[in-house]
Structures are given as C-alpha cells and as structure tokens.
C-alpha cells in the first residue's frame, strides 16, 4: 500500500512522546515494536480502559451477507490524528465518515506494526452494523527482520497470533487485516500460514463473526510480488482466512479471473481501488465509479482505499458537500448495502460526530466547537442533489447558523456553504429542510431504510421539529406485510391527506409537547407481523395555504421504541444508590496567580453488574464554595453553574485541566447515564462524587 507524503509528519503528531503508564488525557495509539506486542505492555498503559469499544454490533446476524460487499480502508494522513483523542477534541473540522450504509467492513490503517482502531470508529461503525478491523503490517527491511523473529518457530507464530486476537477481543473490534509487504525466507512460509490460520481460529472462538483478511502482497514463495488478482501464489493464504484484499493495480480482466479462481468464495475477494488514483483502474477520485461498476458486473467485492482523499485534497466547495457528492458515486454504482435499524430501540439525532454546540432535550449546554466520532448517531440515508434549488434542500446540519433568516445574502450563503446555524434538540446536529413549496403541494424524502420486524407489542414513534407557522413536517412510515403487501402510515400533527388527490394512506395524529423552542410529536401503533422498511420525511403546508413560499423546518430527532422491550430493558435508569463512583489519580497543580488546576480520573460501576449496559455517560462538574461538603449529596441550590465536561463511552473519564479558582473549596462531579434510546435521568438524581480540595496539597511537579 502507498505511503502518503504526510505520513511522517502525521505519525510524529499523532502519538506524542509521553509515559503511557502515567495519567494523561486518554489517547489511542499503535504498537510499533514486536517486543511490545509480545510483552502485552499495551494492557499496562493508563489509556487501555479508555480504548475499549462499548457499542455492540447492531445487526441481526454476525455473519457477512452472501453478496458482493464493500470494504473501506481508512488511511487518512497516517492515522491517529484528531480521532486519537478518545474523549474528543475541539477541532470541529476533523475528518469524519457518515456514509456507513454504503459499506460492510471498515479497516483502520496506518504504517505502524499494529494499528489499533480508535474506539470512536468501532463504536460508530458497530452502531450502523459495520465490522471494524485493525491492521498488522510489516514493510521493507525492518519488516523482514520482524517476520524473521515472529516466524522463527511454529510456537512463536501462534503466540503472536494470540496476542493480536487478545487485543481485538479486549478492545471490542472485529479482527485484522494482515499486510506483509516484504520478502520472507521461503522456509518460514509454513509458519506464516500457521500464524494466519491460528489467528483466524482463536479470533473466531472469542469473537463470533470476527474476520481475518489477507492483503495481496507476499507470495507463498516468500517474494513480495503483488498479484492484483487471485492466483496460485496468493490463494493458499486466501484459503486460510476470511477474505483477500487485492492490490489496486489490477487490469480490466482480473476481477472476472479472480472470481473464477475463488469459486463459491468470490464474495470474499475484495478488489482494491485507490481513491487517490495511483495506478487504479478508472483513475479513482471523481471517476471511482468506473472501477466500482466493473466489480459489480463481475460479482466480486470492492475494497475502497483512502476515501480521505476528499478531505486531504480539500475538494471544493467544502468538505461536507464534497464528501456527500463523492459517496453518491459509490451509491449509484453499488447501491445501499446496509439497512438499519434492525433492532429496537431506534434513535437518531443526526449527530455526525462533530459540531459547534451541544444540546440536551432542546437546551443548549455548550457553544464550543467539538469533535468526537463516538457521539455519531445513526445516520440518515439522504439523497445527494447537486445544484438543484428548485426542490427542498435536505441537509444534515452541524453548524447552527440562523436557518430562519430569509435575506437574499443569507440564502445565497446557505446554498453555497450548506450550513445552517440553529441549535439542536440533542447533541450537535439536525436535518434542515429548506426550499420553495406551494400550498397545495407536498415533498417527501427518504431518511432511513430499516428492517424492523414488529410484534403485537405497540411501538411509539416520536420526533422533534422546529419550524415557522407555515411549514409542517410529518414522518411517513412504510411497512411490508408477511404476504409482501405494502402499507404506508403518515405520523403528523394533523391529517393533510384529504388535500392531496394523489395520496391514499392512513394518517396517525400525534400528541404534541413543547420543549424549549422545539415541538415534540408522539404517536403509538400496532403493526403485528409487519416489517418497517422505510422512514421518510413528509413536508407540507398548513390548510388554507395557497401561495408558494419559503419552507423551512428542522428535524431534531426521531425514535421508535417497543413498549414491552422498554419495560424489560436492562438500561432502565437506576438511582444513584445503585452505583459506585470513585476518584483516582487526584492531583492539584498550580495555575495562574489566583487559580489551580485539578486533574482526576473518575471511575464508576453498577453495584450488581460486572459490565454496565450503558454505552454513554454525560460528565458534569460543579464548583462548591459553601461549607456543606458532605459526600454524595447534591446541593439543592448550587453555588455555581453546572458545566458539561464531556461525554464518556466507558465507565471512566479523565479530567485533565479543570481550572478552579482560589475560593473553590470542592468540586462535585456528576455522571448521567444515557440509554441507547437517549433516555436519561434527572441530573440532580445522577451519581455524584465530591472531591474536597482543602485536603489536597498542590503538586509543583
């Protein structure tokens, strides 16, 4: 695989030189030396527990689908850039992917020996039903020496395979891409086969649905000789693992030839496509669909390498628009490969993992920029319509400009930059619907393609809207019956169907509740035996609206819950007394003349559970200036503002730089557990811990 010009710089920036055992802001990092893999030193690092993925793989089956698949290999500036900050960072312009419905497997790649995916990618990919692999790579002379040591004996090969399997299992990702890009002594090839075979065996035992994929590089003769197709020189490795990632300099006939050699396993052949276009069929970049179309015709799988090209080369007009445009090429060639959600509860606030503000139930908690891909919720399957201002534009917004500004200058900027700055209902995103709509017309657009098999238990649909009085927004649900008959139901605050001659469907009127400036709609229904197959937005005007006018509405969230499942859910919120919370590594260091800096690691757990069912926690801090310092007691009248510090996805959070003024006697930390359906308890009933500063000595390092 190619090494970009930015790799050396990126690697030096990615993992700072620090003592990985000493407490510090949690980071993700690779393992660079074989000895470190052997010694298991990763598990001794302060950062280990923060790097665990906690979101389970949310699909009905652990197996890959029996069809041509899409693998996406990350490769972005050498890896470990903004995504290395496990608790997030302040660069809202960091690289992100949100087109998960167009892929089956995501590989995190760098040129370090053992590339461990940052948990943000695994959390988000699993939420969308996508498997995540790390990368084991050896290259050049150093790689040859590494292989010589690793493959010295059969037992050594097995031991290193077990180390890799242990890492994947402990950290919650789904396997490895094995890339040996150097020569190997031919007499060690049997041990290389044992390494691959044993890795697959151990991984499959510990992680159902795990994958080991071989990269087309070294051959069974020990030569580094890229084949670009499945041949007798690389097939022996293919036979031992779950798939092969073919090098990307293949010719037009190679996909079909590879499919013939693979036989029944042709879907396990992933033909590489370099998005930068370095020797790839069709040239990659904006003509990537040429290669994708050919692979689809030949009924083999695709491996898209380095989609970060859009970001790294600053494709115009801006990253968000260019990213949507580029991935629309993939969709046109390959179609939608992921249908989600497949399990309940279903919830999305359209958060893309970055933004300019954070809101909670309509109330803005922060107006600071942020980046944390773990926070990405289920992404809508919006269709990309370039330069078409004659219809309502539908965009996911993370920026928050005033979308209700109808001045000509603002409208031009809105369409050019695809950004509206309105606070969100939850998180940092929403969907903006904006354009011209006649009074007697309606507009629909796809949001999600679920595959939810429903029972006799009622389901509740809720969604939040912010709009002016002339713009209405409903949710259109499409169902399939056991006999494959289709049925659609409109969930809306009123029944507009009688006004539209071309529509014949049932309307379910919602109950309405106002939360801040948002209107929350809710309705329940029973669709026993049916399958929910599509969720769409339905835009229309109130009755008696006749003229064409500007339509604008924000969709803040949408959720679908099962009544019975909700009552039996282990994530039913528990009182603070059901938890234990502790402070570790507490340290007070000098700040400026009138302040100090508090550093502390917070850890919590449910008393009766070994592993928490929660995958998200809001962490707050509150300065205490009173003399009431009784632990585990929330002040009825806080002496200062409660501040959101961040969001944790494991039951731990490291507070690295909390500035406390000289008159602050203690800091109360509060942790608010959040359910998968975004349910959460009251903050004043959350588990909490008081850290008394008066008994702490100031550490001057």
Swiss-Prot record:
It catalyses: an N(4)-(oligosaccharide-(1->3)-[oligosaccharide-(1->6)]-beta-D-Man-(1->4)-beta-D-GlcNAc-(1->4)-alpha-D-GlcNAc)-L-asparaginyl-[protein] + H2O = an oligosaccharide-(1->3)-[oligosaccharide-(1->6)]-beta-D-Man-(1->4)-D-GlcNAc + N(4)-(N-acetyl-beta-D-glucosaminyl)-L-asparaginyl-[protein]. SUPFAM superfamilies: (Trans)glycosidases. InterPro entries: ENGase, Glyco_hydro_85, Glycoside_hydrolase_SF. Disruption phenotype: No visible phenotype under normal growth conditions, but the double mutants engase85A and engase85B accumulate very high level of free N-glycans carrying two GlcNAc at the reducing end, but their counterparts with a single GlcNAc are completely absent. It is found in: Cytoplasm, Cytosol. Its main location: cytoplasm. This is Cytosolic endo-beta-N-acetylglucosaminidase 2. The gene is ENGASE2.
């Amino acid at each position: 695989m190619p090494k970009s010009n930015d790799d050396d710089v990126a690697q030096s920036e990615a993992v700072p030189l620090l003592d990985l055992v000493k407490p510090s802001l949690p980071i993700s990092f690779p393992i660079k030396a074989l000895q470190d893999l052997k010694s298991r030193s990763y598990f001794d690092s302060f950062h280990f527990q923060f790097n665990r993925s906690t979101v389970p793989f949310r699909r009905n089956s652990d197996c890959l689908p029996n069809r041509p698949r899409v693998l996406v290999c990350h490769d972005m500036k050498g890896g470990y850039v903004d995504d290395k900050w496990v608790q997030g960072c302040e660069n809202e312009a960091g690289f992100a992917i949100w087109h998960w419905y167009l892929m089956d497997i995501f590989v995190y790649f760098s040129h370090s020996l053992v590339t461990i995916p940052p948990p943000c990618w695994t959390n988000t990919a699993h939420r969308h039903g996508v498997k995540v692999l790390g990368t084991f790579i050896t290259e050049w002379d150093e790689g040859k020496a590494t292989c010589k040591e690793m493959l010295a004996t059969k037992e050594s090969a097995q031991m290193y395979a077990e180390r890799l399997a242990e890492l994947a299992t402990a950290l919650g990702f789904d396997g490895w891409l094995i890339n040996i890009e150097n020569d190997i002594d031919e007499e060690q090839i049997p041990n290389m086969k044992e390494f691959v075979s044993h890795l697959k065996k151990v991984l499959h035992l510990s992680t159902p649905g795990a994958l080991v994929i071989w990269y087309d590089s070294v051959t069974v003769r020990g030569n580094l000789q890229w084949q670009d197709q499945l041949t007798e020189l690389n097939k022996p490795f293919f036979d031992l693992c779950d798939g092969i990632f073919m090098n990307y300099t293949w010719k037009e006939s190679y996909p079909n030839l590879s499919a013939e050699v693979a036989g029944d396993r042709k879907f396990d052949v992933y033909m590489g496509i370099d998005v930068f276009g370095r020797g790839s069929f069709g040239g990659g970049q904006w003509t990537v669909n040429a290669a994708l179309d050919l692979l689809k015709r030949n009924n083999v799988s695709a491996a898209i390498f380095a989609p970060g090209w859009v970001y790294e080369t600053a494709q115009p007009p801006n990253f968000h628009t260019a990213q949507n445009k580029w991935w629309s090429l993939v969709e046109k060639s390959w179609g939608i490969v992921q249908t989600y959600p497949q399990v309940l509860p279903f919830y999305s606030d359209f958060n893309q993992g970055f933004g300019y503000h954070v809101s909670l139930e309509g109330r803005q908690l922060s107006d600071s920029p942020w980046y944390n891909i773990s926070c990405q919720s289920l992404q809508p399957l919006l269709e990309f319509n370039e330069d078409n201002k004659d219809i309502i534009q539908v965009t996911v917004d993370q920026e928050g400009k005033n979308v209700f500004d109808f001045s000509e200058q603002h409208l031009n900027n809105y369409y050019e930059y695809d950004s509206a700055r309105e606070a969100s209902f939850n998180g940092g995103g929403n969907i903006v619907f904006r354009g011209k709509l006649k009074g007697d017309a309606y507009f629909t657009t796809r949001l999600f393609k679920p595959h939810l098999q429903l029972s006799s238990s009622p389901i509740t649909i809720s969604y939040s809207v912010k709009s002016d009085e002339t713009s209405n927004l409903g949710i259109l649900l499409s169902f399939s019956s056991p006999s494959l008959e289709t049925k659609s139901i409109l969930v809306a605050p009123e029944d507009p169907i009688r006004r539209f001659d071309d529509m014949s469907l049932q309307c379910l009127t919602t109950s309405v509740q106002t939360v801040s400036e948002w209107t929350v709609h809710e309705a329940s229904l029973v669709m026993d035996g049916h399958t929910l197959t599509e969720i769409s937005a339905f835009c229309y005007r109130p009755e008696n609206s006749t003229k064409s006018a500007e339509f604008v509405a924000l969709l803040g969230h949408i959720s679908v819950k099962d009544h019975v499942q909700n009552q039996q859910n282990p994530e039913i919120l528990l009182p603070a007394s059901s938890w234990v919370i502790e402070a570790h590594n507490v340290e007070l260091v000098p700040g400026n003349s009138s302040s100090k800096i508090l550093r502390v690691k917070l850890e919590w757990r449910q008393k009766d559970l070994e592993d928490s069912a929660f995958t998200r926690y809001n962490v707050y801090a509150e300065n205490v200036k009173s003399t009431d310092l009784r632990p585990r007691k929330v002040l009825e009248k806080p002496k200062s503002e409660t501040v959101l510090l961040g969001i944790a996805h494991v039951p731990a959070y490291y507070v690295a730089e909390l500035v406390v003024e000289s008159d602050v006697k203690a800091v109360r930390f509060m942790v608010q557990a959040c359910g998968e359906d975004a349910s959460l308890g009251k903050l004043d009933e959350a588990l909490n811990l008081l850290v008394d500063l008066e008994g702490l000595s100031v550490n001057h390092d």
